[in-house]
Swiss-Prot record:
Homodimer. Heterotetramer of two MnmE and two MnmG subunits. K(+) binds at residues 226, 245, 247, 250. Pfam families: MMR_HSR1, MnmE_helical, TrmE_N. The gene is mnmE. One of its GO terms (molecular function) is metal ion binding. This is tRNA modification GTPase MnmE. Its EC number is 3.6.-.-. GO terms for biological process: tRNA methylation; tRNA wobble uridine modification. Its main location: cytoplasm. It is found in: Cytoplasm. Keywords: Cytoplasm, GTP-binding, Hydrolase, Magnesium, Metal-binding, Nucleotide-binding, Potassium, tRNA processing.
Amino acid sequence: MSDNDTIVAQATPPGRGGVGILRISGLKAREVAETVLGKLPKPRYADYLPFKDADGSVLDQGIALWFPGPNSFTGEDVLELQGHGGPVILDLLLKRILTIPGLRIARPGEFSERAFLNDKLDLAQAEAIADLIDASSEQAARSALNSLQGAFSARVNHLVEALTHLRIYVEAAIDFPDEEIDFLSDGKIEAQLNDVIADLDAVRAEARQGSLLREGMKVVIAGRPNAGKSSLLNALAGREAAIVTDIAGTTRDVLREHIHIDGMPLHIIDTAGLREASDEVERIGIERAWQEIEQADRVLFMVDGTTTDAVDPAEIWPEFIARLPAKLPITVVRNKADITGETLGMSEVNGHALIRLSARTGEGVDVLRNHLKQSMGFDTNMEGGFLARRRHLQALEQAAEHLQQGKAQLLGAWAGELLAEELRLAQQNLSEITGEFTSDDLLGRIFSSFCIGK
């Protein structure tokens, strides 16, 4: 297998459909056109032609599109054959194409990888293709499209350019120490550095919003048996996702629902009631419940309001609170307000949000929805936003750390060499986002998660 091979893959989903598309990219795409079509179509024009087998018989008839490189998606010669979407027809056509020497099936994401390697798009834009396909909401799709069009990359490139200018200024101060003007102490470098840090903080904030849109928030409903956890899952999901009975311990395994609140994706997880297990099946369910709790972004601590008047989680169940991860946010949900007569709504107790509601009737559930949205700091009115991945957030965080360390060197010791090194490392972190400095292993992992024909 060579990167110089001409590759072919189906660009439409598998199965039956009105249209099926095969995409070919590489040096032999021209030969494929002349062999299968009998001619080379006019560049960037739709040509309705028969697709022929080796013996000259017609396999299908459809539209052929020819994009000579470098003016194509991949930067190479690209041929698209758009025929009927029957799997048998597409398979016959694919087999015919693969009889031509030098052609092979594309790896997942290889078309996008070649576009990246040929400078047709940067790494953040390439990732946006997969994010656009996988978008689970309208807002996520719009943000992915913004990233594909270069919104995220433009912000990162602006930071890289600012760091380049700053590094030139610092290097000049180091190389010409005998000049009358002390560049390091006259305040200009500090002012420029503060501007870059402020711009980076703004990009980090937008990237966190983009990560929320892409990754979603994992919320685990936990508590004792029969507290109403499954009823709350159903209320949030808007359907009967979980079985609800008066029998304690009805939920034995983890139940997952994916919902959206004003465009924000939420992964709601209902868990088995936490208690001393009565059998092996329940023990496994409780063990899985704790695994989910430890990986959660937030826990909804479900309390049966008819069993206690306490509102402080440490008073309600100290052993449960003691076992939770130290920094895990908790929302106390006092359920069955329709029975206890408690006033619906949200308050605060010991630094934790407290919400009184009735999962059975749905009263107060909207308060919980708004609380979940606000707790993540999600801005539903965000215009021109972009999607971001965890690796993007990590790169931005590392760049911010290097800039802060560089500032400390500047203010503490006027150490120009150390400041220059921190600026270089910050610039390298930012360049990893767009792929200017990225390891081959990381590129392989990123593109292998794509669809075959992308």
